[in-house]
Amino acid sequence: MKRAAVLLLTAGLLAGMVALVGCGEKKTTLETPEGRVEVSEEGGGKITYRTGEGEATYEQATEVPSEEELGAPIYPGAEFNEEGSGSVTGSSAEGEYSSLVAEFDTRDDFDKVHSWYKGKLGEPLYVDSEAREANWSKVEGGRVVSVSIQGEDVGVKIIISSTSAPLSP
């Protein structure tokens, strides 16, 4: 249960940090129901969050991560989207954790992308053909790897994430 909470917190922090990268703030302190959060922007798309329970650092991606780093294949010809990609590393009382998220776009249609990933990863955990979305997830080597595809007006958005966190006792 704690591991799931850490994974969800990491994903939430990553989403929030992506939104804050361009804000230009250098250092801010926030009061939340859970306590004080210190936010520091260190430049170059790097933001650090510190609380009484640990810290997390987000860094916006500038290079395409490898399939090995992601733990999943990258759809051929898909274009890397730096703005939707980055990494989080941090520590808490439970130990160290890290998350890497890479976003890609392709002009290919949903069915073609879905078929390709199905051939590489097997049946998705979730698929909604009408909404044009599918998700795969696996736990491997101490990390959770997820692939999500979402049909867009033109083409498909692909999000691959790899998260490592301490195992719950």
Q: Can you say where each PLM-predicted feature lies in the sequence?
A:
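Bacterial N-terminal signal peptides that target proteins for export
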Residues: 1-13
